[in-house]
């Protein structure tokens, strides 16, 4: 297993009360696991009510997971009363799985050994970015405008999952559900939007102040799903 990461950031003065700053963080990790065990699923009951073993499979699972993530942000003062900031996030994780099962499947045959394999590759991706602005004292007045624009993408991609089973008649391929299948899946969601508000002061006295905020929000989201199965 391996995991590394790092960060880089700084800020600079641009003069006249303005500054620019940024921060970047990135990480990478890889993890490999192997699990073994015994699966005795779907037991039956004896006449006295005790559990009786129905299926018995020796199982082995190998998995390799990789994760990459990046986070960045930057902010700049355009003037003493106006600033813009940017945020971006990216994450991608993948899994490569191999599953092996061998033993007695009573629903197929109690007199022969059944062997099952499943290979699977799975990837998940997340991306998000946001741009924000804050503008004070517009036109030498006390008006304040704030706005935010954003976009995001989420995806789950399974480009290949295949399963096969052997048993009976000299370990021949079993023509049954879950054997000789290939499955593909792709789920994706996209979002983007914009939000803005204008702060308008009404009055300000020693006893208090009053203001009104006007604004609006727009958001669009769409999702697509594609599944295919071959046998």
Labelled PLM ranges:
Residues 1-99, 124-129:
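Transmembrane beta-barrel wall of Gram-negative outer-membrane proteins
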């Amino acid at each position: 297993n391996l995991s590394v990461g790092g960060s880089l950031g700084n800020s600079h003065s641009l003069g006249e009360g303005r500054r620019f700053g940024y921060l970047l963080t990135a990480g990478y990790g890889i993890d490999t696991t192997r699990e073994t065990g015994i699966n005795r699923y779907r037991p039956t009951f004896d006449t006295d009510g005790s559990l009786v073993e129905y299926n018995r499979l020796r199982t082995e699972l190998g998995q390799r997971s990789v994760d990459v993530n990046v986070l960045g942000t930057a902010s700049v003062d355009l003037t003493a009363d106006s600033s813009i900031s940017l945020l971006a996030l990216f994450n991608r994780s993948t899994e490569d799985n191999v599953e092996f099962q061998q033993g007695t499947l009573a629903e197929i045959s109690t007199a022969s050994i059944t062997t099952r394999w499943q290979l699977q590759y799975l990837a998940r991706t997340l991306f998000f970015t946001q741009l924000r602005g804050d503008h004070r004292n517009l036109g030498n007045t006390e008006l304040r405008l704030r706005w935010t624009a954003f976009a995001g993408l989420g995806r789950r991609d399974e480009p290949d999952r295949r399963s096969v089973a052997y048993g009976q008649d000299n370990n021949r391929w079993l023509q049954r559900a879950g054997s000789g299948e290939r499955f593909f899946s792709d789920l994706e969601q996209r979002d983007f939007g914009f939000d803005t508000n204008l702060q308008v002061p009404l009055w300000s006295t020693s006893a208090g102040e009053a203001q009104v905020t006007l604004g609006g929000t727009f958001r669009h989201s769409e999702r697509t799903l594609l599944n295919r199965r071959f046998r």
